[in-house]
């Protein structure tokens, strides 16, 4: 199987895909998003790429670089560059006739070429693919707009090289989109395909003629400064005016308020592609004032009406340039996230007298999709001759259950391809526990309280037994439609129960998912500390209970003596009482108590085992940290469900 990938290096967002087993997979990044912002940020301590960079842009505008694609392969005195540079919050300076960005990084002033910035984004896409494929990725097909000239193409290729990629080929974005739809295989005779690509920052229309698998770009047109961000701006201006009308205050003077408003506007715009109305709620947006309002799809369409209409001019231009009538267009392909907007789809369809455009592949993923197919062909993946490609879905967030101490134990990790099935064995937390509550959560955080509860059910009728003895097998099964079945079986009695969770019930929207995963990144360090703390607590608790149980074993007192037995029992009980009273103690405190308890227990237990003849010494004792046989304390094998 080839490890070559296709990368759509976009102005505002980038996307990576891989072709294997007769299908293309769009690879989600570490935030669970299938597209990654083309942003790089520099701070006093680190460099951020993608979502992390875009999320902090409001706080760090001068050192957050975007739109590198508008600068790459151009001269500093290019009017396009001069014009763009005026509007950027970061500095663009002239270095030997080339534009470079100047930022503060780790306390020093540094300059980076557009190639370097693009290479950082490509590196991020490469790592995203490597994390998913579990192996190094070297070969890639990278896409560029059809109007890119030779120096822009070469500079893009250089960016790939800097990122450690072997760029197999630079292909045109419209060509990639046509390949994604298998249009090169659709008919034997020459046919004309119009690609309408409305992205985040740019708008490109291309007319391709495809003849026996050979693509020829007949004409291109477009607007390098029209895209989703312009629609966001219209919405932002409208909302800022409304805020001013309601509160007699102008929030446009505050960069952070504007950035928050823009984020909300982008989210509202996305929602309006599928709903007729959406609400915007921003707490303390400006000078402590909360901003709540709602906006309808009709109002949004009216705000952007002239922009939407202007998309048809380039369509007319490519038809004129290629001397074709609109009736001669065989296929229309919609590409770019902004073509999800219903009004845009309708305008295109109406222009072509009701002809329906191709849009079965996500428009923001179609280019990477086609690039991945091309990469597979170039690396000799024979199966790619079959065009029956499927778009595989993945589980966007990890799924698991709550175990002792409110910990999220993941059964299905994020980005697992669905359908999938996974089972794990758990046990009880208390002696003679009659039942367990299975609570199903989705999310990336260590503690279930920070994740999203999908559903819960009780498995009762467990026969009385000491803690850690009953074996409860929990199975997660997601089908191709994303419907989750969770079942639990007590292996001794065969008692079972299950729950079915469908997509819409209690599941998160894409926005929520993005938010949660972004939070998970931010809190990762805290999460790790918390996990260690709970582990130390569970370990101590388990150790204390096991010691206490040992004392009650029938021959224990004879072997170690009445006094030692009492001493051990008291120490164990003391630790249990302390634990009950100190649920929020630190990792160090738990470890300290564990040491103290071991100090009392080890000599006594050695005496007991010495008398019993040869023993495992004072290794960890079965319980929270171990299976029925006692396992190293590097993590649970049998966990407990409260």
UniProtKB/Swiss-Prot annotation:
The modification Phosphoserine is found at residue 552. Keywords: ATP-binding, Cytoplasm, Nucleotide-binding, Phosphoprotein, Stress response. Induction: HSP SSA4 expression is restricted to conditions of stress. It comes from the Eukaryota. Its main location: cytoplasm. Pfam families: HSP70 (PF00012). Residues 608-642 are annotated as: Disordered. InterPro entries: ATPase_NBD (IPR043129), Heat_shock_70_CS (IPR018181), HSP70_C_sf (IPR029048), HSP70_peptide-bd_sf (IPR029047), Hsp_70_fam (IPR013126). PANTHER family: HEAT SHOCK PROTEIN 70KDA. This is Heat shock protein SSA4. It comes from Saccharomyces cerevisiae (strain ATCC 204508 / S288c) (Baker's yeast). The lineage of its organism: Eukaryota, Fungi, Dikarya, Ascomycota, Saccharomycotina.
